[in-house]
Every structure is written in structure tokens, then in C-alpha cells.
């Protein structure tokens, strides 16, 4: 029994080391990718280090979301390898989400956008899923999102005025 427990403990320790190594490798790749990307024409950087490019600007005067807004968006998330890990386009329908429940990069960027805007975000790991990763997203991975803000919706239980 002790031998089984020792083997299990060693297996877990090795798996943790492998995840840490993967995160470190991805963090290095993220730094290189983002440093090079920042030099491209049209790429701007937000205070957090999230980079963005305006693909299409919507009409002026549209209402920007706040941190607690519900937003209707179409989006595609990719790794820097080009692998798509999530896409509302592939599902054939936009998503409605509460902004304060999203990754920090989305919260920051969407508050700068207006309905009709389409941006490409280049997300450092600490503004995405960090050293843990999530699902198909490896630990420490930089991310690329194409986001189209379709609408800012009234929060549930609130009366929209005007």
C-alpha cells in the first residue's frame, strides 16, 4: 500500500512539474510574441498590457458597456499557433455574457468598445487564463480574440431608460 501511495505521489509531483514547465515555456513565448506584435502598425496597448487592433469601427455615439453590463458579442478565441479553442461563429449564434464574469482582458477592452466595433485582442497570460490554463488553453498561453460587440443590453432586473 505504501508503495502505491509513493508511486501516486511521485506521479502527481511529476505532472505538476510538467505543468509548471509548460507554463514557463508559454510565458516566454508570450513575451516574445507580444513584444513583436506591439511593433506592428495599428496595434495599440491598453494599460494592462492587452494589445488590440481595430478591425472595424462602429457608429460614433454608441453606448459603451460598464464592468457590470450584459453584452452581446460574436467572438473567436485562438492560441498563437492559430488553433481555435472557442468560437460563437462556429456555433452560429452570438453569445450574451455579463462583463464582470469574463477574463480581465475582455472586461478592459469591451469597456472601450461601442456596438458595431470589431477588435482583435492580443492577450498576455495574466489577463487571460494565467498559469492554470483552462480546457484546451494551456497554462501560461497568450491568446488572440476577434471580438465583435453587437449590443449592450440592460442588466437583468433593471429598467432601461431613454
How would you describe each model-predicted region?
Residues 2-162:
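Cross-family detector of peptidyl-prolyl cis-trans isomerase
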Amino acid at each position: 500500500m505504501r508503495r502505491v501511495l509513493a508511486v501516486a505521489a511521485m506521479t502527481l509531483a511529476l505532472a505538476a512539474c510538467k505543468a509548471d514547465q509548460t507554463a514557463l515555456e508559454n510565458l516566454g513565448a508570450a513575451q516574445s510574441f507580444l513584444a513583436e506584435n506591439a511593433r506592428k502598425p495599428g496595434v495599440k496597448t491598453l494599460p494592462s498590457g492587452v494589445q488590440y487592433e481595430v478591425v472595424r469601427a462602429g457608429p460614433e455615439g454608441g453606448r459603451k458597456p460598464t464592468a457590470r453590463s450584459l453584452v452581446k458579442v460574436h467572438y473567436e478565441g485562438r492560441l498563437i499557433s492559430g488553433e481555435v479553442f472557442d468560437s460563437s461563429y462556429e456555433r452560429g449564434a452570438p453569445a450574451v455574457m455579463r462583463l464582470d464574469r469574463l477574463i480581465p482582458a475582455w472586461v478592459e477592452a469591451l469597456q472601450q468598445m461601442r456596438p458595431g466595433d470589431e477588435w482583435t485582442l492580443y492577450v498576455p497570460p495574466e489577463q487571460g487564463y494565467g498559469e492554470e490554463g483552462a480546457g484546451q488553453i494551456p497554462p501560461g498561453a497568450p491568446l488572440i480574440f476577434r471580438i465583435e460587440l453587437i449590443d449592450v443590453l440592460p442588466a437583468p432586473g433593471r429598467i432601461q431608460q431613454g
